[in-house]
Structure formats: C-alpha cells, structure tokens
Amino acid sequence: MDDKAASPTGKMQFETQPAEYRHWTLSVEGEIARLIMEVEPFAGQNDKIELKSNSYDLSVDIELADAVQRLRFTHPEVKAVVVTSGHDRIFCAGANIYMLASASHPFKVNFCKYTNETRLAIEEASAQSGQKYLAACNGATAGGGYELALACDDIVLVDDGSSTVALPEVPLLAVLPGTGGLTRVVDKRKVRRDLADAFSTLAEGVKGKRALEWGLVDAVVPRSKFADAIAERARKLAASAPQMERGPGIELGPLEPRLSDRAIEYRYVKVDLDPKARTADLTVRAPDSIPKNAAEAHAQGAEAWGIRAARELDDALLRLRFEHEQIGIVLLRTEGDRDKAYAAGEAMMGLDWIFRETRLLWGRVLRRLDVTARSFFAVVDEKSCFAGPLFELLAAADRSYVLDVEGVAVRPGTLSGGALPTFNGLSRLQTRFLADPKRADAVVRAGKEGPIDAGRMAELGLATVLADEIDFEEELRVAVEERASLSPDALTGMEASYRFAGPETLATKIFGRLSAWQNWIFIRPNATGETGALTVYGKPDRPKFDWRRT
C-alpha cells in the first residue's frame, strides 16, 4: 500500500480546510454545528482501495481532526456539534479493513495513534471548550464508527429493526478496536464487564432496545422521529454547555512548510534530518513579539506566535511519525529571546477565549509529543530559550543535556504549574518529581522569580547531564550514538513506561494498555499472518489460528 496521502509533492498533507473536504461537510447555525460524514469511496489515500459503507482511512480522519480544531478557533460560539452520516442506514463502518490489511505495521500503529488523538480532542473540546458532541447514529455503527460515537457526550441510535452498534474486530479480524473502544465502553460508559465481553464478541452487534439496556447508547428513536429528536437533543445539549468566554472566531490559515529530504521548515519551527545517523534536530524559535492584550491577540489571529508555533510543531511531529520512520532520536532545541518566550506563556493564562484555546492547543501538541515513539533529548546551550511553553519541551524530554556556562538558563512559568497536563492528568514537573510534589512547585516558583541558570538547574533536578564547554559536545555525541545503537522496539516500550508515572486515566489506559496490546496483536500470525483473520478477510478462506494462549 502507498502509505502517503496524495499531494503534489508526494509528501503527506495533514492540513486541510472545509472547502477542500472530500468526506465531511461542516455547517454551523448559531450555537449548533453539524458534521456530516459522507465518505467519497475513491478519494482516500489510495485510490485503488474503495472506502465502502462510510469506512475511513487517514485522509478521512485528517478532515475530522481539522473540523474539530476549526470549530474551537473559528466557531467558538458553537455549543453543540451533531456528528451524523450523509448515507441512509449507515452511520460508519469504521476503519477500512482492506486499507489496514495492506498497510505496513508502522503505518497501522501511527494511524491508530492519530485517530485516538482525534477522539481525545473531541472529548477535550467538550470538557474544556464547552462544545458538546452528539452522535446521531442513523444506521449501522460498527468498529471505529462506534468508537467515534463513544467519544461523543450523547449517543442516539435509530431504532429501525436492523441498525446496530458493534465492535466486531475480535470475532471478525482477530484484532482489537484500535481507537479506544474497549476502554471507553467500561471506563467511560461504565458498561458491566460481562455485558461488555459479550458485546465485543458479537460480530453482528446489538440492536436498539438491548443497546440501550446495556448502556451502549443513550437513546433509541424510531426513524420517523429521528430528525426531530436529534434537533431537540442538540438544543438541550447546547443549553447545558457551560457559560464561558466565546468568540468572535479566527480563521486558521495554511502553514505551507518547505520540505526537502534533509529538512522540514516553517516560520518558527525547523527540523534538520540526518537519515544516516537516524537523528533529527527539532528547533522551535521564540516569538519576536507578543500581543499586549486580547484585542491584539484577536488582531493577530492564527498568525500569533502562540497559535502558529504550536500548529507548526504539531505538523512537524506528524511528519516525523509518518514520513521519517527511521529517525529514532530527536534533539529538542530552542532559540531566541527567553524573556519573550516566558512572556508569551504568561499571556496564555489570560481569560479571553483566544488565550484559553491557545493554551489548550499547546497542551494537545505536547501530549502528541509525549506519545510519539522517538527518543527526545533536550539540548540546553547558549542559544536556548526554554521558557514559558517552550520549557515544556525540556520537561517532556527523556533526558536533558545542559551546557554549564554563564548565560545558559531556563525559565518555567505559570503554564508549567498544571495548565498543560500530560495524559496522566499531572503536569510534567509533577510526573518528574512524583516522590516529592513540592519540588515541582519549587521549580515553578523559581522560574517566576527569574531565569534558572545551569548550576541551579542541576540542583533543582532539571539536568540529566551538566557539562562544561570542554565535555559538553562529546557527552551529547556519545549519548546520541549509544541511543541510536539500541533496539527501537525496546526503546519505545521503555520510554512509554517512564513517561506516564503516576495515576491512570482513560487516555493512559488507551495508549499504555489497549494500544500496546493492539500493536503486538497486529504482528501476530493470528491477525496478519498468511492465514490470519485480517489477511483473509473478504476471501473464501477461513482464518487458521495458533491456539496457544500467551
């Protein structure tokens, strides 16, 4: 399979806009938006694979992710979003099976990770931006289609005697629902364990009345009354949204990165690639100026550093995942005016909706970094400005290498006190100092007092290695070469285990348990071997299993 989305450059395109959507229609009327899924069968990543029955591939989910983010920035006045299908009697059949069967293992993993991040963004929009989601399941709702519904606040299934909700992956394909389905059924909807077990082994799914009794949906409505019921529930959902600062919105323009075999360049972010060494330098530049107030922030719109730099970093991370699989180590660097980077972070704590959404955007991007399967080393030297939101890059890194010379300093701000939580619900500093939470508070207090120099960084526990000018480059070189020699599989598992110490949440269970099992199952012969269920799906052959339990 060609794992790259169609584009003039041959590179993947993670940006889009409503006028370019091929699979979704976004409309807004006052406080209520409608997202209608009507997948164009031969307009996916691979035009040889037909996306039947409103099934999706990455191109479909890229549009969904764009719509979710665009609603928050361009239409903050929206309080309820109705997600439904433009097809009669089919809501969504989930991820396209033939796409998955023909995709490489790394692509499968990154595809599922991306779809999980999009569903979590929907839930965050509900919890933090006051935009509630209603799944209007007007037909069969299976696999990833039901997982999309599970991310919504309210699920309504049409009661027509045939429409079902289903998670058929285990009985049909010998894999797991890859977008959080199992976790949300029991953790979010709190379906009884035995019923959840039965549900997830019923390939045909569960119809209306039973789906309601089991807690799989919130309402079932006859087809003749469905449209009116959805409209009424959407109005009630909008009325239940919290009172908060909203609008007017801003437009999200294109990023237009410059792409080559050795670099990915944006206005504030640059990735220098060294394919031979399997390393990359990811540098984020501090702002040249920051808005003094909300009016200036609105005037700058999506071109403001806080929004644009975060979007650029997000796009860069996705390109590293999908286009540069063999880059295993990323050196995180920053450059520019440290004071302005710090001030930009403090401005994000403002009350206006645009500051709130900028702050939440940085949170999503940093969490995408947290679950990106790369080794991240922060490099703190004379050019660095790890301050404000950029300090979180250091806090997110697996290690930090600090040059011990005068002038080298970092400066965490208010954001690092909990405004940008990881998936475990804690700040990165709280996760770092799990044994003594007061140390996290001490770091934030120190940053508010002024820059923290290299020696003080070591005292506060912010430096993995502190080295002088003579040893610094050699220490870093040896560490990178050593890391590059280790198994990427083992490193991914080790890093994921260490990055989320502390409490478990829905998200950590999805990424740390469900996704980990799914990634293992994806390479097992029972799923993807020559006679595995995913391989022979749609063929006359029956799957042949290795019956040993492991």
Regions found by a protein language model. Name each.
Residues 147-148, 184-185, 198, 393, ...:
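Hydrophobic/aromatic ligand-binding patch that stacks against planar heteroaromatic rings
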Residues 156, 218-219, 464-465:
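Conserved phosphoryl-transfer motifs of two-component systems
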Residues 97, 101, 106-122:
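Well-ordered mid-protein domain cores that form the structural environment of catalytic cofactors
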Residues 86-87, 91, 122-173, 199, ...:
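Glycine-rich beta-to-alpha active-site loop
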Residues 180-195, 425-442, 451:
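Hydrophobic, secondary-structure "cap" segments at the distal end of domains
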